[in-house]
């Protein structure tokens, strides 16, 4: 036998040994994959066909639409009383079903997002969609095992995407809309929805179809216990999603200079929220000072920063918060204090969800805006240090927004 043939045989044997070792490793370390490989080997033609059909599987929009109607069945009188408006949710629900393994920002195209609210008026948003959004927000935040949240959660996400679409489009066409957005979905959400409606149970006026849902018939009333952390987390997703969509819009336009005003517009939106956070911390300081002595030592840097800022902080939100909570009964003060801390924490976490990398080129080119953000962050940190609330201080120190930030 020639030397060349011997070498070929040795290589073949070595190759076979390598494959045997490889298969043995798969069999021992991943039995599921091994069984799948065996079953595929037994029926190659059938399995290839199955794989192709699985890969090219098209989701039937009609089937999805049936599901969304099924999920709102317990609220038929409230959600299906206007089927022409409810129909606007169907394409959004189909979009969610087709992209359930992707993040919202990665899945949606800007034109597609705009199309979701194209034929929906602001009046329809305010009078029909928004009240139902708040109802589902409250229901999804209930501490109960009586409700299957899965379907309702999808309907809530559908409504939230509609709101993101509407507000993202309106901010571009109406410069005053930024303030409206923050006043309605941050300030009013905290002052009127959380403090008044949820904590103090004022102005509830729930429609009959909702009261029937809450009343379980065994003496239980489902709306008695709310998970405030979940409530804030669900709702503030709306805020950072709108900000992120605005940043993605700017990023997709390659011409930098015309986008300067849009960058500034997003920063103003962010600054409004920062003022609300600061105002809430000042409210917290007033509450804490009623129960324990707060010592402000002017020798400490953070105390000097706090006192300086106390004079210059815009009082609009601060006065409104004080006005709302001044009527809170003594027995509810403990609950109010708890909610205050949760809201502050949730808003700080919201800032971590903003896609700051999209703002980075602008902040580098115009450092004055970054300095302004750094200053506002310093004001918030100083106020938190005055409260001596360890959880809030620790969470804030660990947070990173637009840049690596030095602590006071």
Swiss-Prot record:
The record's InterPro entries line, in alphabetical order, gives: MEI4
> Mind telling me which GO cellular component terms the entry cites?
condensed nuclear chromosome; nucleus
Q: Does the keyword Thylakoid apply?
A: no
Instruction: Write the record's keywords in alphabetical order, separated by commas.
Output: Chromosome, DNA recombination, Meiosis, Nucleus, Sporulation
The record ties this protein, via Pfam families, to:
Mei4
Location (main, coarse)? nucleus
Biological processes per GO annotation? DNA recombination; meiotic DNA double-strand break formation; sporulation resulting in formation of a cellular spore
Question: Where is this protein localized, as stated in its record?
Answer: Nucleus; Chromosome
Q: Superkingdom of this entry's organism?
A: Eukaryota
Q: Does the keyword Protease apply?
A: no
The UniProt function text for this chain reads: Required for meiotic induction of recombination, viable spore production and chromosome synapsis. Component of the MER2-MEI4-REC114 complex which seems to be required for meiotic double-strand break (DSB) formation.
The record's note on quaternary structure and interaction partners says:
Interacts with MER2 and REC114. Component of the MER2-MEI4-REC114 complex.
- Family assignment from sequence similarity: Belongs to the MEI4L family.
Identify this protein by name: Meiosis-specific protein MEI4
The source organism is: Saccharomyces cerevisiae (strain ATCC 204508 / S288c) (Baker's yeast)
